[in-house]
Amino acid sequence: MESNNGTGAPGAFHTQQVDNAIRAIQHKRPLPEIDFTIHTMEDGSQVSTMERVCKDVQAPAMFKPSDEQFFEDETHTKPDIQFLKQHFYREGRLTEEQALWIIREGTKLLRAEPNLLEMDAPITVCGDVHGQYYDLMKLFEVGGDPAETRYLFLGDYVDRGYFSIECVLYLWALKIHYPKTLWLLRGNHECRHLTDYFTFKLECKHKYSEAIYEACMESFCCLPLAAVMNKQFLCIHGGLSPELHTLDDIRNIDRFREPPTQGLMCDILWADPLEDFGQEKTTDFFVHNHVRGCSYFFSYSAACHFLEKNNLLSIIRAHEAQDAGYRMYRKTRTTGFPSVMTIFSAPNYLDVYNNKAAVLKYENNVMNIRQFNCTPHPYWLPNFMDVFTWSLPFVGEKITDMLIAILSTCSEEELREDSATTSPGSASPALPSAANQDPDSIEFKRRAIKNKILAIGRLSRVFQVLREESERVTELKTVSGGRLPAGTLMLGAEGIKNAISSFEDARKVDLQNERLPPSHDEVVKMQDEERAQALERATREADNDKKLQTLSRRLSTS
């Protein structure tokens, strides 16, 4: 027996430890009283747990309205606009029947309208909304009450923002109320292809059902394509086309269908002015639009030629985010008026662009631009994920890390023994023998322990892959890796703002999402391949992890 170097009997030492532990339990200090109605934030400020921390965002409405609440009067011919406005503001939902009623009644009105609308001033023209319902309410504050103000919307009511169905239902309800003073055009996002790729289809299924989505798809095919305002301005979502010579070309389109990927209907929804519009080095009227992956860029010369031929003053369009909410392009030689104007009505687009939004008010031959900023809104995790689904990979990764850390705990003596067994020149491990296959043999049990440790390591790496997927922001993908810097999503809007500091940064980051997206089958295939590669990489890293190999070897031989 080894001596304990004069430190006394080991038994007495352990007895003293036990006595101390018992004494600590018997004379336990009383726990301090905690007021659970008060929570201290990271910055030291205190908030009440009995109230909402974000008072700018109202508590959600937990009920679905009765027909008495939904309809304006007993005739049941018009929805109650004021009720819907407040109900949607509180994230309230309608019954399936009520939502379908709004969409179908709106569809009847849209179907009866021509491809090319004609309206007189005064009117307020609005650009992209993109599911930003709370900013849409601000738009009506700035632009005027729809009961007293004439409105023309240029499309893109859905996708990217997480309140698209509320935007559709509210705008369609306004159309039912004011069919002759509120007009809705089609944007490139009002189609099956983009709504399936981005968020609108998922949103409809999450908040309502696929039947609501299908009703919206039918309704989108009924939206008019263009408008001539005050016999002076062509209003469209995208831009010009090599196939657009006169306004009759628009009137002759068969619009009741999914937009094609080329041709006049495609170009009206997808085309853009050249980036160096007005200072082009090319003499071509149209250049392939490599940014969108379809349609064209049109030149200053193309715009001037079209305006002169059709006796128009300017083209008013949407389709492109603008830092100031609008952009005036080079003036025409004949009228001195901007040949093209872009209006964008979604402020702080995607919660990261930091842009202003704008509407264009035209009255008494005077054109005014009204700008406005974003409004606080409820937060949704990407793809309408619930917090448990989103956070499980984080929890799983930490638990496996903790398990490995616990198993890695060892004394210096054990480490010395392990390094001795793995010293250079040591013999290679023996090949499995018949005895090693016996479940009762020591070798078999050791190998089983080793495999379990390695499996935990692989599991840890897999959770890491899943955690990285949870951090992926599906709407914003950086050019260099498909995701924002790790952790920015957990930091919420502030973290993303730090990662993307300017409008131009955000625009560059988001550029690939402005393209015509791949088909659903291609997306599924790419996602499956990415996941398989990530999991294969995770397994390979775990198998080559020296710390794990050392740990498994030490535990299996102890």
Curated annotation (Swiss-Prot):
Enzyme Commission code: 3.1.3.16
Residues given in the record as Zn(2+) binding sites: 156, 188, 237, 319
Enzymatic reactions: O-phospho-L-seryl-[protein] + H2O = L-seryl-[protein] + phosphate; O-phospho-L-threonyl-[protein] + H2O = L-threonyl-[protein] + phosphate
Binding of Fe cation, residues: 128, 130, 156
Superkingdom in the source lineage: Eukaryota
Biased composition (Low complexity): 420-435
PANTHER family attached to this UniProt entry: SERINE/THREONINE-PROTEIN PHOSPHATASE 2B CATALYTIC SUBUNIT 1-RELATED
Quaternary organization: Composed of two components (A and B), the A component is the catalytic subunit and the B component confers calcium sensitivity.
Protein name: Serine/threonine-protein phosphatase 2B catalytic subunit
Organism: Neurospora crassa (strain ATCC 24698 / 74-OR23-1A / CBS 708.71 / DSM 1257 / FGSC 987)
Record gene name: cna-1
